[in-house]
Amino acid sequence: FAAYLDIDHGDIEEFLNIKEIGSPIQNLFMGVCVPDYWMQDMIDGDMEKRKVWAKVLESRQKKGLPYIFFTDNVNRNKPQVYKDSGAVINASNLCSEIMLPSTADESFICCLSSMNLELYDEWKDTNAVKLAIYFLDAVLSEFIEKTEGNYYLSSARKFALRHRALGLGVLGYH
């Protein structure tokens, strides 16, 4: 799970301290959503925004978090199908690689996995990629089945039913 908070939210400074030693929720992945107007104000010299930005960067240096999600940039560059439907991308997942829309009724979820490039020669001429996609789809099907009737996961279940978002990437590319 990743929690994202708008950088101009009144609780941003408290949010940036969530992962401090002694905090009861140190294991939370977190990100900040930064709109264009806020970033431009900060660049133009707004001292309060510069202080907040410095705290964001200091936190990233110390803890690797928060992830930084540039809201307007993401929505300008979202797929045309999302633009045509008026879908808004509000946040991302715990590593900020997924850009899916969400609403009050639908909380996005995605089943992800990776293929290890170090082992590429072992799987390049096989059906491993196809099987991995089938596996991810089976995981999503099980999620849908097991969350039926669960009020607390109903918005995620609704998204899974409508979108069936799967992602298969690679690791070890460097």
What are the residue ranges of the model-derived segments?
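Conserved, charged catalytic cores of large soluble enzymes
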Residues: F1-V88, V170-H174
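Function-dense linear segments that define catalytic or interfacial modules
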Residues: R60-Y67, T71-H174
